[in-house]
């Protein structure tokens, strides 16, 4: 199990602690909502969705979080400015914890920032993400807002080695800091299987070892384009879930503090797997600390039986 020499920074958002040493705090799980193709989605442009089914998904995830001790964060996607506003508004009224908001559209991300500012939600909202493609308008909106927490996505198509990936991360973290963001979560970026998947796991260790920042990762992206699980003679949904679970616990073992596991509908499978590995990490770290004579509080899994 991994024990880092450098200090590991942490911060709190509500009742949830981000960062810290491996095993010190429970792994945070981030479930996605309102992405195209999800059963809850009705109209991506207008931001309409099945509120009853969405609430069922949230209730299930909250129950699993309570039973395992692993915190839950919601990842909200919005295709348009109207959609991101509708989604954030509804989630802020129907979920008490922190949430991430994002879009592939820069104008939509800016509207998300503006809405959170207008609604006083920056004590809960996390911006995803500041990266090499961030526009000047986004950066200006961030500087003019009360945004406290953001993800720094350290990915570049030119960064194909650990050294290059780390330099990209350092550059983006520096940019995030200059924009006035207090709480920075570093994300090395996840590539699909066959297109670089795996380097981000090595990069996670380097990030924690060298920078000591809270980390997050979206390993569910790895099997997203994996042709192996899309063969006609396979139960594709079953294999997709298995792949998401496997990629999630791999990231957990490689010291990710927060893990985006894709669709919230997979909460039961993902939380159960992470709880199991959480027990393994707890026992391994306790033994390592005893051997190294380190006195530090550790997360005690609720599922230790």
Task: Set out the residue ranges of the language-model regions.
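Active-site beta->alpha loop and helix N-cap motifs at the rims of alpha/beta catalytic domains
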Residues: 9-164
């Amino acid at each position: 199990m991994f024990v880092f020499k450098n200090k590991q920074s942490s911060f709190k958002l509500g009742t949830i602690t981000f960062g810290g040493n491996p095993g010190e705090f429970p792994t945070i799980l981030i479930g996605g909502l309102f992405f195209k193709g999800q059963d809850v989605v009705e109209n991506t442009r207008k931001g309409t969705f099945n509120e009853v089914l969405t609430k069922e998904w949230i209730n299930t995830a909250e129950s699993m979080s309570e039973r395992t001790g692993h915190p839950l964060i919601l990842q909200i996607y919005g295709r348009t400015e109207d959609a991101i506003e509708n989604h954030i508004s509804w989630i802020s009224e129907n979920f008490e914890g922190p949430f991430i908001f994002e879009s592939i559209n820069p104008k939509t991300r800016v509207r998300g920032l503006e809405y959170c500012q207008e609604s006083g939600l920056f004590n809960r909202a996390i911006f995803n993400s500041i990266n090499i493609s961030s526009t000047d308008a986004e950066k200006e909106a961030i500087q003019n807002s009360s945004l406290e927490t953001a993800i720094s996505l350290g990915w570049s198509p030119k960064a194909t080695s650990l050294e290059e990936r780390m330099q990209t991360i350092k550059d983006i973290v520096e940019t995030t800091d200059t924009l006035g963001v207090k709480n920075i979560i570093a994300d090395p970026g996840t590539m699909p299987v066959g297109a670089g998947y795996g380097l981000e796991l090595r990069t996670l260790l380097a990030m924690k070892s060298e920078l000591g920042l809270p980390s997050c990762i979206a390993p569910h992206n790895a099997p997203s384009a994996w042709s192996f699980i899309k063969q006609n003679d396979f139960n594709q949904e079953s294999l997709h879930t298995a792949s998401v679970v496997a990629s999630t616990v791999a990231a957990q073992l490689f010291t990710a503090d927060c893990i985006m596991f894709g669709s919230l509908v997979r909460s039961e499978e993902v939380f159960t797997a992470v709880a199991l590995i959480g027990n393994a990490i707890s026992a391994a770290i306790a033994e390592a600390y005893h051997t190294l004579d380190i006195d530090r509080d550790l997360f005690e899994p609720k599922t230790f039986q």
